[in-house]
């Protein structure tokens, strides 16, 4: 696995009561998976758009802008993207004065708090983003369950 510098990022998750996550493509799947697991393992209210919401909210336009109207009610909004100049980072910039934000991305963003995952491929990034969010949970004291055959 890649060496990821978590710095102050666990404290963002720790202090948030509600978390909104978003991403594109495989990163949207990571966001949906993590919204479920953060809720299940921490008791925090977490949500991410599903494919029905992304197409219904967006219509012929950009779904991320419409969805952020919901996300801005969260204490923390996490965006997961493989490009630091994307619709995901633009959406985070729109709400960063209303709530705490965290961009998970391979490169540092010029104005967003960025957790850098130095991946070389899309798939490596998606898998490492998922693993990194589990590490954030462990850093705030969450005990993640073992596989059943290991118990």
Segments predicted by a language model, with ranges:
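A short, well-structured juxtamembrane/interface segment
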Residues: 1-16
